[in-house]
Every structure is written in C-alpha cells, then in structure tokens.
Amino acid sequence: MQHEIVIVLDFGGQYNQLIARRVRECGVYCEIWPYDTPLEKIIEKNPKGIIFTGGPSSVYEENAPVVDKKIFEIGVPILGICYGNQLIAYFLGGKVSTALFREYGKTHIKYNTNSPLFTGLPESSICWMSHTDFVEELPEGFEILASTENCAIAAFGSREKKIYGVQFHPEVVHTEFGQEIIKNFLFNICGCKGDWKTSSFIEERINEIRKIVGNQKVVCALSGGVDSSVAAVLVHKAIGKNLFCIFVDHGLLRKGEAEEVIKTFKGQFDMNVIKVDAKERFLKALCGVIDPERKRKIIGEEFIRVFEEEASKLGDVKFLVQGTIYPDVVESGVGKAATIKSHHNVGGLPEHIKFERIIEPLRELFKDEVRRVGVELGIPEKIVKRQPFPGPGLAIRIIGEVTEEKLEILREVDWIFRKEIEACGLDEEIWQYFAVLTDMRSVGVMGDERTYDYTVALRAVTSVDGMTADWARIPYDVLERVSNEIVNTVRKVNRVVYDITSKPPATIEWE
C-alpha cells in the first residue's frame, strides 16, 4: 500500500526530528530529506506537503542552504518554519532583515484565525521563538497571519498558492496549540487523510522482510533491550525459524540481564537463540581504552566480528538484523547535521562487513513508536516499557578504562538504584535511570578510617522520545536511601552525586 507522505526538508535546525514526530502523531507518514535533495526526486515521491525546517544559517550567507526555486511552482503545499519561513520570503521577493536583538523563548502571539493554518485556535496565545533574522516585507500576494510585539510578521501565507511561513516553532511543547497548527497544515491545507498506523507499518514491514529474505537464513543482533527485542519479534513473525538470534554476552550487561534474555526469548517466544560468552574478548579489546568514541567503535566492531563467526557456523547467511531506531541515526549525523556521538548500530559499524545486507526494520521509528509496535506484536509489557540501554552497555557508563572490577562495582550500584526506583513506583514516570562510575576518587571516612574511593553519579531523566530530556525530580528521601545503601554495601565507593543536567546541553548518557 502506498501511503500519503509529507517530506521534511532538513536545514540543520535542532528541532527537526520533533517536526517529523509531530507529523506522525497526526497519522501522516513523513520522511526527513536533506535540503539539497534534487527536485525531481521530490516530485517523483508525489508528496502531499513539504515542510522547510529551521536552521542556524542566514539567507544572506554566502553558502546558505537553499532549495531549487522551482519547488514553489510544483503545486505542493509548503510550510516554512523559522529559517524555512525566511527562505520562502527571500526566494519569493520579500525582505529578510536582522534584528538588533535575538528573540528567544516564550512570546505572546496574535493569530488571524480566518486562515486555514490557524482555524480553531484562540486569537492570542503563547509561541516559542528562537531567531535573529526576521521577515520585514512580504512577497507579493501574501498576507500577514500572525504577529508578536517584536515580530510584526510572525506568520504569513497565501491561500491561493498554499504556501505558508511561521517564524516561531509549532513543533515544540512550549508553543501552545502547536500540534493543532501542524494538524491544520496537514489536513486543511495539504488534504491529508492520516492513513499511517502502527498496524499497517507492521504488515508492510513483514511483507518487505519476506520479499527481501525469501527462504534464506537471517541473523539477528539480540540484546534484550526494547529496540532489538521488537526488531527480533517483528522479523521472527515474518520468517519464523529461519531467524537465528545471536545474543552476545559481552560482560557489559546489567545484573541478571543475560539470564533474563535467554528465559524470555528462548522460553516464551520459542526463538532460535544462540548465546555467545565473549566477556574476555571484549575486555581484552577495551584494555587501556579511555576515549568514549573509541570504546563505541571497538564494541561495534567486536559485535560484528562475533556475528560473522557465529553466522558462519550456520552456513550461508547473508542478512543481519539490527534494532537501529531514528534517534540513533540522528545522533550519528543525518544530512548536514553534526555528529553528536556514534551509535553502535550506525557509526560504530566497521567499514567491511561480511553480511550482504543489514536489515533495520525500525530505522524510521522514534522510541515511542517502537513501543507501540511492540505492544501490537504482543511483546510483554515489562520488555516493551523497559528503559533504553545502550548497545555498548556499561562500557560507556564507566568513565575511563573498563575493567572487571569496575564492571562489578557499577552492576551493584546500578541494581540498587533501579531496585529502589521500581519499589517506589517511579519506574513508569522516569524515561531512563541509571548509574555512572566516574573516574574520580575522593577522600571519605568510614569506620573511623580514611578512604579514597570512587564517586558514582546517578542519572534519571524524563522524556518522550529521547531527543530532549529533563532531569527527574526524585524525592530526597528516595535519593537518601539509595545513597546510603550504595556506600554501605558496595566496595570501593564512598560518594554518590545526582546529575541535574537536561538534554540539551548534555546528552542522556555520559559517554
């Protein structure tokens, strides 16, 4: 089935993935493409609408990202956001200027609710601004649709041309009625029907996998996390016993995790699960390595080598399944965006892979979408709602060199923290919570004796999709109990700190 599609052209803004997520929440499928995608390719896809994202550039910069001007003549509705809004005005004959001061944060805005873009909205509300340049004069044939105290043209458009621009960011939660604005664009202006659903995604992926794989054997990288679990069950549903799940126990897992994975997938789902004990191999490869990017690359490479070796025992295996999801791709660098950190499912892969093809059935989904797919597939709630755990495991939660002793310390600390959070019923409120073993030692006093031991950091955040996150406000008495148990029961730890940094500026993981 061919779904209606909206194309999001990426100009390098920080909220671009949120735009895609908001569109999908409306039941409309969308894809993010680089801003310099050839117009012919866009036309070939027959999109219902096009969205220009924000970005850090100015339209007057020498190498500013631009589009083919003919895009405004193909009859497809366009919505420009922030930089995209300025680009539309600039290309169509308007004037863009630079403000004396940057406008950033929540701003009162007044809408022309007669416009199809703002139908159903109150005449005034709050929006989120983040810009220096602004549209000073409109292109011919366009009208002002919204304004703020400092931005006379906060939105403009042409009902006839179906081209609209907004200087603010409707995709962020700080903009009141932002989702309604996006819905209005999709349904009132683009004429979308909203035919993209989780159930149809599953059916299409199953058919696609069967078509690609046929009767051949497939190896799946199974870790027991949400992503790899959903990927494994989805592929198993498509090809059954031709799927061989390889579970690599690299010694970097949390307490009791390896045993739980085998019990669930081999026992409950009756899958072919091959367990590989590779603890010594990974520790040897990580010996002396301190740089987090090197850790990720080494772990990714060792993973693939183990898969190759195990797959060779199965005969001719051409396909490898991985649980890569959209934020993995985003943070590893998409289009012109900068790389934040390498993910073992993306940038951590070695250049030479002996498998003919990597199958990533969840590559286009955000985490919340992956969870919904998992529920549809009948995966137990305890797995579907499991908090994210990075592929490199505890290796990137140990700052500095990874050793067996440090792993044992971190496992115990992490287990104590997770146990207490679950006992208090906070596990469903918090997106992710874990411990980090820092490379910092500090002086302490225990039993009238001086100690000089490790400092551990506790990290807990609230989020929806992992793209942005805020630190969780865990009650002090809970943190106190966790801290007391850690320093009293875990050897070589004498200090516990709590990380209160949001994302951005920090990432959720420390490495």
From Swiss-Prot:
The active site is at 82 (nucleophile), 169, 171. GO terms for cellular component: cytosol. It holds the Pfam family NAD_synthase. Residues 196-386 form the GMPS ATP-PPase domain. Keywords: ATP-binding, Glutamine amidotransferase, GMP biosynthesis, Ligase, Nucleotide-binding, Purine biosynthesis. It comes from the Bacteria. Pathway: Purine metabolism; GMP biosynthesis; GMP from XMP (L-Gln route): step 1/1. Disulfide bonds: none annotated. ATP binds at residues 223-229. Residues 5-195 form the Glutamine amidotransferase type-1 domain. It catalyses: XMP + L-glutamine + ATP + H2O = GMP + L-glutamate + AMP + diphosphate + 2 H(+). Its EC number is 6.3.5.2. HAMAP family: GMP_synthase. Catalyzes the synthesis of GMP from XMP. This is GMP synthase [glutamine-hydrolyzing]. It comes from Caldicellulosiruptor saccharolyticus (strain ATCC 43494 / DSM 8903 / Tp8T 6331). The lineage of its organism: Bacteria, Bacillati, Bacillota, Bacillota incertae sedis, Caldicellulosiruptorales.
